[in-house]
Amino acid sequence: MIVTWLPSWLSTDLSLISGFLTWIVVLSWLWRSGWKIQRRYFIEATQKPLTRNAIVWSAGIVGAVFFVAAQMRPGMPGVMTVAMIGALSAYVDARTHRLPNAYTVAMAIGVVLGLVVGGVISPLWQERLLGALIGALIWFVPIALLNRLPGGMGGGDVKLAPVLGALVGSVGLNAAIFALALSFVSAGVAALWKIVVGSAGTKTRVPMGPWMIGAALVGTIAWGVVPDWL
């Protein structure tokens, strides 16, 4: 552990404090300028952009939920940032089939800060850092390869993949593999359902961003917790 003198209660407090500060910072950024980023993507897709109030309120609620859900995770800033900004980015992708680069960068910053906080308060900081690096590769390599195929993954998915892989990889390599598989399975089920109900054809592209972000958050929060309940 980088800081060996921290008692367990202080480690818990630092995790909660870092999560709360992340909640404040993300909301402040969205209120000041972050909310504007999505406007261009919706306008170019001839759709109505989201309002600032809708974005900030939604992000605040999502952040509050994940603040409670992720309080036992040492890398809370990463979880909070991906949850709050990722939810917005996922919605943009679902509507426009594009992932805003600025939101991906913001999530990457949050994941890095989460690794730093986790390194300070976790006795397994070396394993977490190595897991994040390998997790980023586990997610990046297959999605980058699929990007080269006709009709494959989009460029935004390739940029987002290592960010999410690092987040869930810091929990464990098995978690990273599980979350990646979950994202593809979920997207496949969603695509099949749309075909069955007649809302899409066999050549309709499914936006992967929402499934990647959702699967990464599920893997990060639930891995090592849910199996103990079963």
Question: Locations of the language-model features?
Answer:
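A membrane-topology feature that recognizes alpha-helical transmembrane segments
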Residues: M1-L230
